[in-house]
Amino acid sequence: TTLKEAPLAVSVTDSETIENARIMDLNDLQSLVPSLRVNQLQTSTNTNFIIRGFGNGANNAGIESSVGVFVDGVYRSRSAARIGDLPKLDRIEVLRGPQSTLFGKNASAGVISIVTAKPSAEKEGYAEFGYGNYNNFTGKAYYTNAIGNGGAAFSLGGGFNMRDGYAEAQPGLSDLNDRNRWNIQGQLSFEPSDKTSVRIIADYSTLDEVCCAITNFQNEGAINAVRALGGQTADANDPFAREHFANKDSVNEVDDWGISAQIDSDLGFANLTSITAYRNNDTFFDSDSDFTTLEILETVSTENKIKTFTQELRLTSKGDGPLSWMVGGFLFDENVEAVDRLDWGADTRRYIDVLAGSPALFQTIEAANGFTPGSSFFGDQHAFIDSFKQENTSYS
């Protein structure tokens, strides 16, 4: 069955098109693929993939996205595990609409399938570097070659993307919306027999960025209260301003790594495919989330640790008979640990008093309960620390 004959709405972007268009990551891909949108929300890790207007799951570590992302057949369950720069590719397929028959429960809006280049027995290598405005340095390198004379081959590739921020921070702080991303991937392929092939892939990527800037506010009561206390905010009358008024640097850190093994075997009557994978994704985010020069929300942080094991088996007919068929099984085992923290700042109580219309409101409540006025509600202290774990094991 050719792509034109397949009963699917699918867009395939080959490696040449990707290179010519300077597609660095999935955020860039939306410029080539109709009906695909990639929205970066308040952190680098909270990136939402949307197909035909549908997509969710970016802001909650306990929810998997409705747009399934697969890299070489391995499911990436969270957006933080798929926002880095792309390695050397063979193609990217975007399937629009529900794809649960072949891709499982988390593909109700569609699928993004990334297929990387396989190792080659023919020696090949390249290195490329780029420079752009805001001191944007990019680099990629790739090398592949045979191992001995037995048909085995390997490849090694990596890259970096570094750029200054373009949103102006307050004096002494780092400009926001910068880039600081690194990645490396190694592959090994060999054929233990003339009917069996094995492909092993290991990869690691890291991200450490100051993100994300808020530059536009509505002129309303909450913002007017900030200004009444002498705080500064973005200019609501200038939507194109790039000045950011937070009083500390934001932190966005992602460490993502994994290993997978794919075994393809010709059984004569059918083809058997096994894909085994383990992935580890650690993220940390902290910001001054009131986005003003006052200390209202001093700390709003999230730390996630996600460990995922998947095993897929597929038995597929060769398509040379009157009936084409496929049968398979899938195991998904995932552990999620998340810690959310919120700290009030030194200006929180003053700010709440202004919003309430009078500082006497909370002082009266404190006095009635024997507290020193100004010492209890919204003090310069922890508001909450929320820790949870989620274990998910599913079979299909």
Feature names for model-found ranges:
Residues Q170-L176, P322, M326-S396:
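Signature of Gram-negative outer-membrane beta-barrel scaffolds
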Residues V12, N20-M24, Y134, L176, ...:
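Soluble non-cytosolic domains of exported or imported proteins
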Residues T47, E64-S66, R78, P87-R96, ...:
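Outer-membrane beta-barrel translocator/receptor signature
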